[in-house]
Structures are given as structure tokens and as C-alpha cells.
């Protein structure tokens, strides 16, 4: 339930407290982190340590005041790169997508981070289109230029000639955003590329960071289960995925990584409160669409997973990899699994999206380049 800090005058009071607390603590942190032994991780730089702590404070703040998301159907500065997608035909939405009668498919905003593809035939055969779902714990984030500039630039630089398409799915922090709202929007946006723009699935790379990776896994699972209405993409790239929502906030809070990673337990609690399906739907936390670690996807497409060595969710990510590897076939007689993994030593959660803020740009660049090499090895053989 919302607390007193989520409504006025409580929000203003708490905001003033947060600003004062942060400003007073900043000089002390600057002195403290001059000594490597006092940093969250002794392998981190001063910049990484200070940025991590300040970002963690911010995460606690937004989860406490429950910051309201901006509108998702307004073009804004993206102008002609922004598109509004109407829901697809009703037969596209089945089973889990209709578990809550109160949540129906709606219009979806999306942003092209290259020259927009606006009509069938404009896409060139062989041109990769990264269908990227942003992170933010299902309560924050967007696919706009400001938030996606670093991620999209890495993908475009590492894969010249490609395109990046970012849907603005409904957030659980807004009315009507509880599960399966974001899931419906992801299906709508993916169907738009395949059916409206007629981009061949073999040219679409499904990608997502953090909660966006969780959503990408759900989208692939749905396409795999419903090939008659939604074909699978060429590959799946997962960046610091959130593969298990069974784990309790208390358990996460007790992990040593909690005091190193920037993910605030309050943010996880906010997500659980606003995102998880209503009890009346009969969809539990252990459902594979909610917690992918509970069942593999019987797919043949390549899956690549990146995570940081200091992530709070590292055990769950490793479990997801093991579960998925157990069902993956081998390459045409080669002894090489279709699940690629890449751990960034000592890194915190989601450096793909947050590197400019928390100081991991070179490591994020290396990770993207490795992902593209993996794709090339799988798709160009």
C-alpha cells in the first residue's frame, strides 16, 4: 500500500530530506572512497564506487515516493522517430495474455534509434533490427533518446547498418500497468515489426536489459508456444536479466551482494507490489512467464546472457542459464551450446543501460562486441 511519502505534502518533505541527506553525506563518501579498502568492492574505482552509492540512494528514493512515470504516447523530442502502434488482431492475444479481464491490449508507443522503418519494403534483407526492451524494474525507464542513447549507440556501432527499435511498454507504476500489460505491449510491438512492416523474423534480434530482459524472455516463450500467430526472432540477447520473482525481498536484502550492487531492496518490493498479477488471475510467482527459472523454453534460437560478477541476482541468472542449457540442442553436429554467457568481473547490475551513470563504459562496450561476435557465429554460419 502507498505510504505517506507517496502523496503530498509527504513527497515534498521526503524529497527535501533526501536532498539534504545526500548533500551532507557526499563529502564523507568522497573521503571514504579515496581508500580502496573502504569501497563497496576493492576492485572498483573511486568513480564507480561513488556513483554506485549515489545511484543506490536514488533507487531508494524513487521507490519510497513511488515516482510517477511520464506519458508513453507523446512523441516528444523523438518526433518522427516515435511511432504509435495500435493493438493487433484479437487472435494474437491468448491464454496468459488474457489472464486479467481488467487489462486489455492498448496502443503502444515506440522509438526508432535510427532512420525509421515506416512501411513494408523499406527494410533491406539481412539488416538486423534490434528489438530492445528497456529495464527499470517494470516501474521506471523508457525507450527515449536520453535513456537509450548509450545502449543504442553501442549496438549500432558494433553492428553497422542495423536498426534499434524500443517499445514503450506500460509500466506497473501507472494505472492499468500490472501484469500482463507490459507483456501485451511487447507482443503488440513485435507483431508490428513482423506483420505490419513485414520484417523477416530472421533479421530481428530480441534484446532486453534487467526487467526488459525478463519481458524479452516472456515474449520468446510466447512466440515459441504460439508459432501460428507469432514467429520466433533470430536470437535473444539478455543483459542482467531478472529471471526469478519467487525470491523474497528479505532474502535478497540479506545477500552480501546487496551491499555492493546498486539495486535497492525497496525497488524490488515496489515492483512486486505493483507488477505481480492479481491473485484472482490464478497466475502465481512460480509461473514460467513470471519466473523463467522454473521452466526452459524449448527453442532452437541462440540465447546470449550477460551479467555482472557483483550482481545481487547472479545466483538466479546462473540458474536460468543452467535450466535453459538443459533443453538447448547442439549446433549441427558441433559440440557448442546455443546458450552463450558473458560475466563481467566485479560489475554491478545492468551496465549496458547504466554504464554512463555508474562508470562501466569500457566493460559495457566489450560486452556488446562479444554479443555481436556470438550472433555472427550463430547466424552467419
Predicted features and spans:
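Conserved beta-strand scaffold positions in the cores of enzyme catalytic domains, especially
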Residues: 82, 130, 164-166, 236, ...
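Gly/Ala-rich beta-loop-alpha elbow adjacent to hydrolase catalytic centers
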Residues: 208, 212, 216
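Catalytic nucleophile-loop/oxyanion-hole region of alpha/beta-hydrolase
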Residues: 147, 165-203, 360-362
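Short, surface-exposed "cap/lid" segments of acyl-processing enzymes
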Residues: 109-158
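A glycine/proline-hinged amphipathic helix-loop "lid/cap" segment
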Residues: 1-118
